[in-house]
């Protein structure tokens, strides 16, 4: 949003300078982006007068001019066709930077004649986009007058408008806030109604869903043409291109009062009725409109359409842009002025669908003051009559705008309670009244927001209004209270585990990925998700329409993208939430990792990773997280459907206490995701890891190694092929925890001597005597315990 100081002074009686205005705006919450001051870039340029102009001796199209300048009389070579004696124009001295040409002037001969400066065009000063010759100014201007003063240029303030303050999209709204902040006195913003002299020959019908309210007025006998200089200068200063008086009036009011309007050429209308309705879908597709920008747009049933010819011919996109067929030109004689209120969400969606980002669309999408329909018509009528003449009809008003905001109770003491500011009730009343709020004093007060402040919905909003105008700089400096450090740190157990997992996996060579919390519904269904309650109503992209049931699909797709870019060897992990329903309890925090090994180009072709690699990384990570790894059961063949059934397993404390799953991703899943395999991975549910027992505050005794040598005993057991060797190892190690310090598999054999359907698992058991060397009888008794424990686990000692 841009405006000039002189424009602001149309609504604000003030002596403040631009820097003071900018400072006050910043303190009041208006975020100033920058100030465009033409005096800076045009400082070297001044008014001059051509005294003589003679043809250049060496060039037919050039003239050698004698020019009176601020630096005295100068000889300047000029190629402009309108250079002539007596012309008052703009002079640029040697050394001046010409912004429109992006050059700095140097003294040099032009076809043999030295030019001591330059005579400038409007385009060269960036005063206009194009020009046919040097500038022609009023002859009464004194030589040496700064170009900025001669052209009436002034600083332009550009600031960012927050979505909740559409009233700031008009200069009058800015003036209101600055007046409340004490920068000046707000002038009367009311608009006197203009009586119509005849009934409007154009009637209006509205579809409340498309356009809740519509005001219009017929004005006959106008004389359209270029706008006066003051209006053109005002629009040009903020970057708008003047078109003609009728159109420029609507643009002025849009920026002056944040009230978009539209003007129709009444003679180009078909019939005597204008209708607002939703777009229609016919036998041959949706309707189309050629808009004022010359482009053709498809009108869908979600859009508001302005139509004539008994509602059959679209002539505009309501709240967005008018149609080319009814646009005003210099030949326009009779007009119909539109001032309507459109539903903001519909206008925002129309803008996104069509790609139109007009000033009207920008304002209606943020909501326009519902109380400005008739005042907007009256102001437009006043300006049109002043600039174009004509005779107005009575105002046509149909429909109903949303109800005005309701009042609510407010205690002025709440300002101090919530903000800490010491503001008297009298000052609070003064601020709220200056901002346009209706305040009824009492116990408590009753405060009603104005129609242009629908963002104010409660007493906390009122405190914010008072605080920003009173000034946050008035807040007393109060140090924060000292908070004792939390015992055991400030992280929860889950947060601490997530941090530990992140460090451990990074140390193991995995790279962390951060992906979206949603995925494609079809992809989610591959991983046990995709339920209706998890589908997004308004996804950020069509391929991200469902909350993720697992971190694995996003990681696998990331590995696939890396592979397509030439980085096939991927080791990725992510820590984040997964979603299994619409209740808070259905959200779980998960640690997932994948390994997509690529076989090196060597003679052995061995890939750098497999199921056992990710299992080892998984167990190491669980150990780091404090999980009871020694108590975990490996349940093979019971993992989820997205794992390879023969190359995956679960780690669990019991059938209902599943802690993690690992293995190779099912080839069918990889094919559906268009990712080359194999891909291995694991997934840990942090909530499934039991909380560690409180550590004893007693100091552990110093390590005291045994003075006796350990001994080993080997056992070979027959077990079914499907039996996990780890079960035998765990059973053997637990046979006598006082003496057995370790047990491990050193051989697995299948072949002659082993029955079909069985395998031989050889286990080495390490025995560490504590107090005395074990006798043969004690060793035999210990061996018997190992055999008995193995038999309970399904093993049979080979004879």
Swiss-Prot record:
EC number: 6.1.1.20
Residues at which Mg(2+) binds: 455, 461, 464-465
Superkingdom of source: Bacteria
Sequence ranges assigned to domain B5 in this UniProt record: 403-477
Main location: cytoplasm
Note accompanying the cofactor annotation: Binds 2 magnesium ions per tetramer.
This protein's UniProt keywords: Aminoacyl-tRNA synthetase, ATP-binding, Cytoplasm, Ligase, Magnesium, Metal-binding, Nucleotide-binding, Protein biosynthesis, RNA-binding, tRNA-binding
Parts of the chain that traverse the membrane: none
Catalytic activity: tRNA(Phe) + L-phenylalanine + ATP = L-phenylalanyl-tRNA(Phe) + AMP + diphosphate + H(+)
Cofactor dependency: Mg(2+)
Coiled coil feature spans: none
Annotated ranges, domain tRNA-binding: 39-148
Subunit structure: Tetramer of two alpha and two beta subunits.
PANTHER family, A to Z: PHENYLALANINE--TRNA LIGASE BETA SUBUNIT, PHENYLALANYL-TRNA SYNTHETASE BETA CHAIN AND LEUCINE-RICH REPEAT-CONTAINING PROTEIN 47
Name of the protein: Phenylalanine--tRNA ligase beta subunit
